[in-house]
């Protein structure tokens, strides 16, 4: 039996390749709930063996991929099947295989081609107690991220045979360790002139992991601000890097030269993206944009231009921090814990409420445009931010703006407070506070409580909006170094919830 791993979403599972050769008409069959791509492996493996000058005995050969009740898809089983046949031909000794796993697709000429999902499969092999894993050479740096298991990069089936025959050993890859800290990108908040209020709101959002909706006329700097958000977020932890890399590996988007992602993802899909493009999908479900943004940011520019089904599909993942894709063959769940940053114009022409330019839209057009963003989705934005046009004095000023590094220091201090507060729990920041501990971790003064009560009654806020105001106020208090939420902290949090009343219920 020769081991390799399969994939269901991000979850790797062990597959044992069993082989039997018996008397009878020469044949070669693969069983074990294999799909068409796996059954085609017979011809790839046959041709690869022939090209490598390896002859199979004239026998009836049956390959079983166990467990037989789990569907096997893809071409990742080729190398393990070939190794099983090599063992049957006495070209490999059992002692060399008992603690090894094999992953890779074979070409007709015997080359070993790269496959997707090597990192989660290597992690599973290490957890199983295996000491060696053989992967395509193009994937070996990805496998070398995992400690406690030797990763061998194989270029061809012939090279693997020489390795087993000890004619030309394959050297295991050195364990990959990122030599530099997380890269925060070349974009900097110092490039943005003016917009001090918007910068402060985004700093609060970064400090607490809050979702942000920006509304403003064209050219006010919404996209420019959003693209600089990763530069003020805290550096990724190693665990976050592994989670993020796993997702990109399964999606086939991992750069072979950068096997471990250390930069927070920034995904910005076009407004024509389909619901499946956002959530993930396909006959073999792959991660969508919301999962690719895991541990990072999802930026939706021109929010009102997205289709209603695409926007509504965000609602549940924003609450659950995971998305489940169901197919006839089963369900797959991907994580999607991300910050949502959205930007939109206030009307079709973009100039409703502009201080100098006249809006040419009718009230009905404005109302119809804004109604594309539903109330339930609007409720899931913690911070509503109006981005005003930049003043000429700010544009022409030669004064230096505050850098992202300086802002990031304050954000990190607030996150350190939160890390201490939520130590030993699955909560990572204030935006993730669950309702059962909300009042415990968000104590308020009597004055703050009265203000919150007045605001709740006067504005007719939903229970979700109330919770989000309290969470934002908790972040503002953390940035202020306060243990108890005061009136001024509530006032700032309420200020960040005013635009839904101005534009949607005005």
Predicted regions and their residues:
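Basic, amphipathic alpha-helical bundle interface domains used for macromolecular binding and assembly
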Residues: 31-42, 57, 64-74, 284-285, ...
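Short beta-strand elements
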Residues: 15-21, 278, 382-385
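Walker A/P-loop
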Residues: 214-255
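Walker B catalytic acidic pair
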Residues: 295, 301-302, 313
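Peripheral, non-AAA+ core regions of ATP-driven protein-machinery
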Residues: 3-213, 220-223, 261, 326, ...
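Conserved alpha-helical scaffold flanking the Walker A/P-loop in AAA+ ATPase domains
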Residues: 203, 260, 265, 275-298, ...
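Catalytic P-loop NTPase motifs of RecA-like helicase/translocase cores
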Residues: 109, 300-307, 350
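Conserved inter-motif catalytic segment of the P-loop NTP-binding fold
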Residues: 240-274, 281-282, 388, 428-436, ...
């Amino acid at each position: 039996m020769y081991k390799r791993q399969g994939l269901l979403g991000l979850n790797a599972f062990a597959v044992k390749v069993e082989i039997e050769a018996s008397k009878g008409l020469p044949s070669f069959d693969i069983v074990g709930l294999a799909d068409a791509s796996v059954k085609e492996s017979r011809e790839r493996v046959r041709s690869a063996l022939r090209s490598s000058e390896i002859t199979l005995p004239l026998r009836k050969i049956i390959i079983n991929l166990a467990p037989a009740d789990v569907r096997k898809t893809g071409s990742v089983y080729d190398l393990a099947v070939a190794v099983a046949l090599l063992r049957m031909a006495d070209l490999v000794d059992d002692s060399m295989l008992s603690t090894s796993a094999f992953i890779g697709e074979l070409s007709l000429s015997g080359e070993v081609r790269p496959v997707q999902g090597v990192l989660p499969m290597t992690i599973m092999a290490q957890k199983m107690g295996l000491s060696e894993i053989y992967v395509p050479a193009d994937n070996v740096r990805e496998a070398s991220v995992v400690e406690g298991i030797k990763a061998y990069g194989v270029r061809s089936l012939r090279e693997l045979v020489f390795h087993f025959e000890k004619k030309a050993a394959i050297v295991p890859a050195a364990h990959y360790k990122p030599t530099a800290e997380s890269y925060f990108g070349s974009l900097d908040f110092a490039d943005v002139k003016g917009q001090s209020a918007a910068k402060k709101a985004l700093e609060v959002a970064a400090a607490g992991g809050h979702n942000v909706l920006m509304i403003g006329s064209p050219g006010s700097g919404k996209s420019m601000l959003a693209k600089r958000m990763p530069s003020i977020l805290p550096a990724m932890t190693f665990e976050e890097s592994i989670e993020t890399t796993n997702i990109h590996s399964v999606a086939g988007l991992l750069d072979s030269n950068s096997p471990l992602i250390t930069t927070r993802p920034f995904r910005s899909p076009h407004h024509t993206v389909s619901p499946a493009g956002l959530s993930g999908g396909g006959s073999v479900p792959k991660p969508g944009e919301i999962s690719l943004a895991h541990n990072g940011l999802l930026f939706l520019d021109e929010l009102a231009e997205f289709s209603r089904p695409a926007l509504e599909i965000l609602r549940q993942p924003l609450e659950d921090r995971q998305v489940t894709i169901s197919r006839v063959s089963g369900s797959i769940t991907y994580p999607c814990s991300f910050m949502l940053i959205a930007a939109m114009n206030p009307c079709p022409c973009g100039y409703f409420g502009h201080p100098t330019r006249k809006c040419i839209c009718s009230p009905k057009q404005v109302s119809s445009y804004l109604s594309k963003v539903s109330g339930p989705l609007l409720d899931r934005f913690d911070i509503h931010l109006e981005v005003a046009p930049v003043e000429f004095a700010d544009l022409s000023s030669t004064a230096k703006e505050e850098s992202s590094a300086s802002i990031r220091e304050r954000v990190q201090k607030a996150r350190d407070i939160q890390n201490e507060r939520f130590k030993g729990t699955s909560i990572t920041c204030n935006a993730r506070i669950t309702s059962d501990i909300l009042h415990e971790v968000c104590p308020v003064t009597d004055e703050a409580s009265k203000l919150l009560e007045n605001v709740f009654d006067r504005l007719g806020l939903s229970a979700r909006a109330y919770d989000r105001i309290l969470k934002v106020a908790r972040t503002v208090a953390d940035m202020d170094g306060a243990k108890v939420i005061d009136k001024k902290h509530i006032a700032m949090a309420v200020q960040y919830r005013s635009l839904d009343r101005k534009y949607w219920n005005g």
